[in-house]
């Protein structure tokens, strides 16, 4: 059985790490390269770097920041935001990213997922889903930083992109983002039950127990968090040890 992963997330706007609530009210949380170095030293399993306004600003991702981040740390790096073409993915991988996260472009053109998986391998292709509950048991996908409804059912869409070659799903509950009330477990479980690839649960972590719930109750392979780590509420080591003490398999070497 694979070990569960903890993934700090750097939401980057104008070259700075930011954190908000429900995708708005952004607060500065520091320099992305410095943050990456800290998380690498602390024993994070991976790092997620999301340029949160690249799609809505209709501009390319900040490759220089990606390159400097990748050079500074040794853990796997997933990068997303404004990834629209195969050339964008190639540029990210050449800049040092291990995986490219695609969202808006995948919604607009499903073939992009298939083409990316064929060109670079499924292991490089993460499809990000930002979902909001529209009624009990149904979640709709939103794009452009959570501003644009699509009418797409999140669970059906996850199933579809995995069939096309997505190697991982990054699943964010917009309702829970930054709220610190825990993951949307019904959403997470619905998606993990529907696909046979790893799912990263995102949106809502406020306590260490929430991390446990994402894996134990939601079925996630990895849990992503931002606020609790960026602002020093908990360390990566505290999170890993708590999850291990709750019976989850964790990589404990290298934690500080």
From Swiss-Prot:
Record: active site: 11, 130
Keyword Heme set for record: no
Reactions this protein catalyses: 5-[(5-phospho-1-deoxy-D-ribulos-1-ylimino)methylamino]-1-(5-phospho-beta-D-ribosyl)imidazole-4-carboxamide + L-glutamine = D-erythro-1-(imidazol-4-yl)glycerol 3-phosphate + 5-amino-1-(5-phospho-beta-D-ribosyl)imidazole-4-carboxamide + L-glutamate + H(+)
Cellular component terms per the entry's GO annotation: cytoplasm
TM spans (from-to): none
Molecular function GO labels: imidazoleglycerol-phosphate synthase activity; lyase activity
Xref: Gene3D superfamilies: Aldolase class I
Keywords associated with the record: Amino-acid biosynthesis, Cytoplasm, Histidine biosynthesis, Lyase
CDD domains hit by this protein: HisF
E.C. number: 4.3.2.10
Pfam families: His_biosynth
GO biological process entries: L-histidine biosynthetic process
Top-level EC class: lyase
Subcellular location: Cytoplasm
Pathway named in the protein's UniProt entry: Amino-acid biosynthesis; L-histidine biosynthesis; L-histidine from 5-phospho-alpha-D-ribose 1-diphosphate: step 5/9
Domain of life: Bacteria
Similarity comment text for this entry: Belongs to the HisA/HisF family.
Subunit structure: Heterodimer of HisH and HisF.
Entry function: IGPS catalyzes the conversion of PRFAR and glutamine to IGP, AICAR and glutamate. The HisF subunit catalyzes the cyclization activity that produces IGP and AICAR from PRFAR using the ammonia provided by the HisH subunit.
Protein name: Imidazole glycerol phosphate synthase subunit HisF
């Amino acid at each position: 059985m694979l070990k569960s992963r903890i993934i700090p997330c750097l939401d980057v706007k104008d070259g700075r790490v930011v954190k908000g609530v429900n995708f708005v009210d952004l607060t500065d949380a520091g320099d992305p390269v410095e943050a990456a170095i800290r998380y690498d030293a602390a024993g994070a399993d991976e790092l997620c770097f999301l340029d949160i306004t690249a799609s809505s600003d209709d501009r390319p991702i900040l490759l220089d920041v990606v390159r400097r981040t990748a050079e500074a740390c040794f853990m796997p790096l997933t990068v997303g935001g404004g990834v629209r073409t195969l050339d964008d993915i190639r540029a990210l991988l050449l800049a040092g990213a291990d995986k490219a996260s695609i969202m808006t472009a995948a919604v607009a053109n499903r073939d992009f997922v298939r083409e990316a998986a064929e060109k670079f391998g499924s292991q490089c292709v993460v499809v990000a889903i930002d979902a909001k509950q529209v009624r009990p048991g149904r979640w709709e996908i939103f794009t452009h930083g959570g501003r644009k409804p699509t009418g797409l059912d999140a669970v059906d869409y996850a199933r579809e992109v995995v069939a096309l070659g997505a190697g991982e799903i990054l699943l964010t509950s917009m309702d829970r983002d930054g709220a610190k009330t825990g993951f949307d477990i019904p959403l997470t479980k619905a998606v993990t039950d529907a696909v046979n690839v790893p799912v990263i649960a995102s949106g809502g972590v406020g306590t260490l127990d929430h991390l446990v719930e994402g894996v134990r109750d939601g079925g996630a392979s990895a849990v992503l968090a931002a606020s609790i780590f960026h602002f020093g509420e908990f360390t990566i080591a505290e999170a890993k040890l708590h999850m291990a003490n709750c019976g989850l398999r964790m990589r404990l070497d290298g934690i500080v």
